[in-house]
Amino acid sequence: MSILTRWLLIPPVNARLIGRYRDYRRHGASAFSATLGCFWMILAWIFIPLEHPRWQRIRAEHKNLYPHINASRPRPLDPVRYLIQTCWLLIGASRKETPKPRRRAFSGLQNIRGRYHQWMNELPERVSHKTQHLDEKKELGHLSAGARRLILGIIVTFSLILALICVTQPFNPLAQFIFLMLLWGVALIVRRMPGRFSALMLIVLSLTVSCRYIWWRYTSTLNWDDPVSLVCGLILLFAETYAWIVLVLGYFQVVWPLNRQPVPLPKDMSLWPSVDIFVPTYNEDLNVVKNTIYASLGIDWPKDKLNIWILDDGGREEFRQFAQNVGVKYIARTTHEHAKAGNINNALKYAKGEFVSIFDCDHVPTRSFLQMTMGWFLKEKQLAMMQTPHHFFSPDPFERNLGRFRKTPNEGTLFYGLVQDGNDMWDATFFCGSCAVIRRKPLDEIGGIAVETVTEDAHTSLRLHRRGYTSAYMRIPQAAGLATESLSAHIGQRIRWARGMVQIFRLDNPLTGKGLKFAQRLCYVNAMFHFLSGIPRLIFLTAPLAFLLLHAYIIYAPALMIALFVLPHMIHASLTNSKIQGKYRHSFWSEIYETVLAWYIAPPTLVALINPHKGKFNVTAKGGLVEEEYVDWVISRPYIFLVLLNLVGVAVGIWRYFYGPPTEMLTVVVSMVWVFYNLIVLGGAVAVSVESKQVRRSHRVEMTMPAAIAREDGHLFSCTVQDFSDGGLGIKINGQAQILEGQKVNLLLKRGQQEYVFPTQVARVMGNEVGLKLMPLTTQQHIDFVQCTFARADTWALWQDSYPEDKPLESLLDILKLGFRGYRHLAEFAPSSVKGIFRVLTSLVSWVVSFIPRRPERSETAQPSDQALAQQ
């Protein structure tokens, strides 16, 4: 290149061009790309006045305007990227420069839209005001009970007949399209309306569309003339029927969450009952158990009516000594039958309190736990169990490996934030094994904690409900614990839950037997069906391959009719669940959770259905470390197999599109879209299997609370605690303070009206943000520190409301990014024998994505550049 430029260009220009070429090479560009980049630069200088001030402003804003194009490392097709991005920017700039009449028209539309949203927001209050008289007087109150039942029966009968006609009426494609547009229009109108009416209306619309779909599938889409198509079609129909049943039961379960609030306790503390607190442990480290015991010691309850027990199934001397030192009771069994359930039942022989509260050994209760829960027991004598959420202050494997901790609701948020609240409406709250209070009398009547299944908690609540006792759920977190540290441990825990729920289904089926109300039966069945999702999920992940590889018509219908039935079913279900579950489960994330677990829960649930007594109990490990980032190849092996299988389907689909019958082209396209969606979800599952580093033994909890620090010379400075752990704190000093790294200071924290002092050492200083390391504490100081931090009554209450609102399209984009991230990890960590395949695939996707225009990264100087760009 230097010889050619020396011959064509004058020395100063040649030297500058050679310098630019070397700069490109230094930043990683290939020789070809660097040479081509220099050539494009020469053409730009010839045809574009780059020295003009407007072009200079654009060049200064290059990173903001062209964020995906690296000016220091050119690529061969960068001019195409510049052209696409420039057109994108010009379209955006022209929108801002619209003529005044258009701007006024647009403003008018915005005004109409704003008034519509305001009207929708005010509608529930208006309806409530107009119908207030109905709350004071029943319209049919003058009729006898029999007449009212007759009228209600007639209304229900006619409603069912109309629903049946609506579901079963056959439509041609045009009529089906018009019908769907009407329903979709209604859904768009009511979805922004606050209150429960809009959710109920969306449920009705979703059920209408989904029931029409499942009716159409059973009556019009099976190919009875082709055995292969029939078998594959029936397998898919089985999975879809399962999904439809779970959808219907799920709507029923959460249609009206109760949102129970605390009941005040009597002022006379002599009326407060006695409570035993059980903390069962088996193989956990003492450091995991200490915080739970320390927090239990600080629970606001009369000390003469509170007994704390360590139930040590490991029989360890250090635990017995610890219990003696802090003044709690200790029980160790000589035999270990029935695992945790047997451990608790053994302790029930010694505890004599009127109530028993159970905490897993890593669940730290707040000081207000009993005061928030016990009032309901005094109000309702038939109440046997009160459950509170399982809240976790450490990230679970999904949150940690994907970097989503406190950014996206975790896997358990839906159950503890919404499902249990919905169960409470139907008096079907499940006992979850921890963070709960149980009345001793009903517990003794059923023989203690159930031992026949490995999910003793749910089985115990089922037995209590069969006896006619009630249960309750309070959504306010009153304890927090450690999430599982690795994906393998997380999957092991879910396997146990899945097998246990299927065992209950076989051994004590809630659909049969006495004592349960109809609504309770449905709630229990839905919980058990949830854990049978493994096989249906695997079917969905492989179903389109039946057509691409086996030429089996799994849905024997024209592609247009498939689109007119399948897409509305999926869209309405997604829209409705986003409205109902948005705070607790973002759209499309259920696909990731179920895909990760599907392969592993399918075999044990199938075995439990056949032989419910087969299997063993496993204990979930807590408090471990992940010292290096790595791919769990054992766990991810099934996902990789499914990825490869779907890639084969893609290859065959491409061949069939170009060389297959023209009449099948649209069906091939539909199947390929399904395969690509499955590949995205499987890529997300692979991304979860990449274990991120976890090198902290003490997890940091982000929380703001006032504090103060005192230097050794007596100077006192106010500060705000930003995060804390069992080993230290992060604080922000209010104002100026001379704090040096390594300096010893005292930290002052308040609990109620009492102030506590803790010795610390400054570990780091960054401006007014300071990291403090706790110095060795006495036992009493450690108890006080836990009660001032982890056990504060307000520590966890606001976490559930901190998640952003669900936006389905943004959530879909997150899943797309997550899937691509999984394949990048495969390319990075894969063995050399297959690394090349994934590198080629990820490079190909990255290359295609690099041409997509980006939204400019705004800065204060970006606006003039946009205007300059529009004027060129």
Curated annotation (Swiss-Prot):
Q: Where in the cell is it found?
A: Cell inner membrane
Disrupted gene: phenotype observed = When disrupted in a cellulose-synthesizing strain (a strain K12 / W3110 derivative called AR3110 with a restored, functional bcsQ gene), cellulose is no longer made and the rdar morphotype is lost.
Q: Which cofactor does it need?
A: Mg(2+)
Q: Which InterPro entries match?
A: Cell_synth_A (IPR003919), Glyco_trans_2-like (IPR001173), Glycosyltr_2/OpgH_subfam (IPR050321), Nucleotide-diphossugar_trans (IPR029044), PilZ_domain (IPR009875)
Using the UniProt record, give the first listed, main subcellular location: membrane
Write down the Gene3D superfamilies for this protein, in alphabetical order: predicted glycosyltransferase like domains, Spore Coat Polysaccharide Biosynthesis Protein SpsA, Chain A
Which sites bind substrate? Answer: 360, 362
Q: Where is the active site?
A: 313, 457
The catalytic activity, as recorded, is: [(1->4)-beta-D-glucosyl](n) + UDP-alpha-D-glucose = [(1->4)-beta-D-glucosyl](n+1) + UDP + H(+)
Q: Name one GO molecular function term.
A: cyclic-di-GMP binding
Task: Specify the domain of life of the species encoding this protein.
Answer: Bacteria
Chain's role: Catalytic subunit of cellulose synthase. It polymerizes uridine 5'-diphosphate glucose to cellulose, which is produced as an extracellular component for mechanical and chemical protection at the onset of the stationary phase, when the cells exhibit multicellular behavior (rdar morphotype). Coexpression of cellulose and thin aggregative fimbriae (curli fimbrae or fibers) leads to a hydrophobic network with tightly packed cells embedded in a highly inert matrix that confers cohesion, elasticity and tissue-like properties to colonies.
| Entry's family note | Belongs to the glycosyltransferase 2 family.
Q: What is stated about domains?
A: There are two conserved domains in the globular part of the protein: the N-terminal domain (domain A) contains the conserved DXD motif and is possibly involved in catalysis and substrate binding. The C-terminal domain (domain B) contains the QXXRW motif and is present only in processive glycosyl transferases. It could be involved in the processivity function of the enzyme, possibly required for holding the growing glycan chain in the active site.
* Designated name of the protein: Cellulose synthase catalytic subunit [UDP-forming]
**From what organism does this protein derive?**
Escherichia coli (strain K12)
